[in-house]
Amino acid sequence: EEWGEGPPVYLVHGWGGQRAHLAVFVKPLVEAGYRVVAFDLPSHNESDPGALAPGRTTATECADAIAAMIETHGPAHAVVAHSLGANSTVLAATQGAQVGRLVFLAPMGEFPLYLDLFAARHGFGRRIRSGLQQRLEKRIGMPLHETNMTWTGRRANYPPLLLIHDPDDPDSPHAASERVAAAWPGARLLTTRGLGRLAHYRILRHRNAIRAGLDFISHRAKDTNVAEQPNPSARFT
């Protein structure tokens, strides 16, 4: 889907999501003079099945889809991405996609760490966890650590980056975003507070997170220490 006129801003949802999950950004971006492009990643919602099977895809396949959308609709002024969509966006940039400014909400900055969490939740031991990694690496055609944003960012020439993340997020560790911010020249990390066990998804509706993303896209980034704090339990620090 597409709305508005002006420099394109792409909305990229996360794993198991759909384009509507970032719909809250559409109206303010259009009002700010941007053309907004949103789409479903392979095997998600209304998109065609991925190469693996219906309902299954990989970060690299999603990266190919993002690169194809940017090639079709024009170089991005910015990309707003959530969760796995953030990793795939940087992978697309390593392929030459012009991604512009990046706003990443609860990104999976280190996919091996996510695999550790998955294995722990399901009670998998070291052998099964190692087997899962080998299968994933075979599917994506590269070592899993090469999907880490600290690795792919360098290959993408470190586009301007704003990370927004909550320490309560159980699905994508905040610590990974801290490491990405430390390793990515010029990157900024805004930390929300108090979003609870559903932080990975609540951040998509967090008023200050949305405002910070819009300001960053429009080159109006504010100091995190003076961000408006209408709700002390959900503030930036």
Predicted regions and their residues:
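Catalytic histidine-centered segment of alpha/beta-hydrolase-like enzymes
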Residues: 195-208
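Alpha/beta-hydrolase active-site loop
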Residues: 54-73, 77
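Conserved alpha/beta-hydrolase "acid-adjacent" motif
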Residues: 170-176
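Short beta-strand/loop motif that positions the catalytic acidic residue
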Residues: 156-157, 162-165, 169
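Conserved alpha/beta-hydrolase
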Residues: 19, 26-49
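Gly/Ala-rich beta-loop-alpha elbow adjacent to hydrolase catalytic centers
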Residues: 80-89
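Active-site glycine-rich loops that stabilize anionic/oxyanionic intermediates
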Residues: 6, 14-17
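Hydrolase active-site cap/lid region
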Residues: 97-142
